Amino acid sequence: MAFGTEPTPTGLADPPIDDLMEHADSKYALAIFAAKRARQINSYFTQLNEGLLQNVGPLVEYQNQEKPLSIAFREINSGLLEETLGEDDLTEGN
């Protein structure tokens, strides 16, 4: 394997987890945060095909066939989204 010939990793390896952790309190919170946003992005693409627009689309440029979770991680790393706890999050586990 020659160095410099491999493509730059994307998705879960890019952005690095250490960079993403600067935007969340824990890995668990980061996973929930990214999953919720990925679900919104996925719904946006589904609604786009149906002519409905109830969710906000990707806030960063994306490539065709890019996974919603990868897009969500890049949005979080870019500082375009801010994690806030909802009332359900505060009462969970009590």
From Swiss-Prot:
GO terms for cellular component: DNA-directed RNA polymerase complex. GO terms for molecular function: DNA binding; DNA-directed RNA polymerase activity. InterPro entries: DNA-dir_RNA_pol_omega (IPR003716), Pol_omega/Rpo6/RPB6 (IPR006110), RPB6/omega-like_sf (IPR036161). It catalyses: RNA(n) + a ribonucleoside 5'-triphosphate = RNA(n+1) + diphosphate. One of its GO terms (biological process) is DNA-templated transcription. Keywords: DNA-directed RNA polymerase, Nucleotidyltransferase, Transcription, Transferase. Its EC number is 2.7.7.6. Pfam families: RNA_pol_Rpb6. The keyword Transferase applies. Gene3D superfamilies: 3.90.940.10. SUPFAM superfamilies: RPB6/omega subunit-like. Belongs to the RNA polymerase subunit omega family. PANTHER family: DNA-DIRECTED RNA POLYMERASE SUBUNIT OMEGA. HAMAP family: RNApol_bact_RpoZ. The RNAP catalytic core consists of 2 alpha, 1 beta, 1 beta' and 1 omega subunit. When a sigma factor is associated with the core the holoenzyme is formed, which can initiate transcription. Promotes RNA polymerase assembly. Latches the N- and C-terminal regions of the beta' subunit thereby facilitating its interaction with the beta and alpha subunits. This is DNA-directed RNA polymerase subunit omega. It comes from Bifidobacterium adolescentis (strain ATCC 15703 / DSM 20083 / NCTC 11814 / E194a).
